[in-house]
Amino acid sequence: MAAVAAASAELLIIGWYIFRVLLQVFLECCIYWVGFAFRNPPGTQPIARSEVFRYSLQKLAHTVSRTGRQVLGERRQRAPN
């Protein structure tokens, strides 16, 4: 039973890091794709470069990071046998 709990915790941590990497990739490059849904019409400044949208994405990344640290917490030490 303890092995299953440990494996679940490891998978949760791995999944969390994968989510963070994907979020960072989204913030850095995917916003500027030509077909991205949040782009403005041609000849206008892309919404991704506007201060409000950039601030919202940065705040989202910070909130997700803080929440993840609260959920995952510190790694627990094994109880002595």
UniProtKB/Swiss-Prot annotation:
<dbReference type="InterPro" id="IPR024885">
    <property type="entry name" value="Neuronatin"/>
</dbReference>
<comment type="similarity">
    <text>Belongs to the neuronatin family.</text>
</comment>
<dbReference type="GO" id="GO:0009749">
    <property type="term" value="P:response to glucose"/>
</dbReference>
<dbReference type="GO" id="GO:0051649">
    <property type="term" value="P:establishment of localization in cell"/>
</dbReference>
<comment type="function">
    <text>May participate in the maintenance of segment identity in the hindbrain and pituitary development, and maturation or maintenance of the overall structure of the nervous system.</text>
</comment>
<keyword id="KW-0217">Developmental protein</keyword>
<dbReference type="GO" id="GO:0030073">
    <property type="term" value="P:insulin secretion"/>
</dbReference>
<dbReference type="GO" id="GO:0007420">
    <property type="term" value="P:brain development"/>
</dbReference>
<dbReference type="GO" id="GO:0005737">
    <property type="term" value="C:cytoplasm"/>
</dbReference>
<protein>
    <recommendedName>
        <fullName>Neuronatin</fullName>
    </recommendedName>
</protein>
<dbReference type="GO" id="GO:0032024">
    <property type="term" value="P:positive regulation of insulin secretion"/>
</dbReference>
<dbReference type="GO" id="GO:0032880">
    <property type="term" value="P:regulation of protein localization"/>
</dbReference>
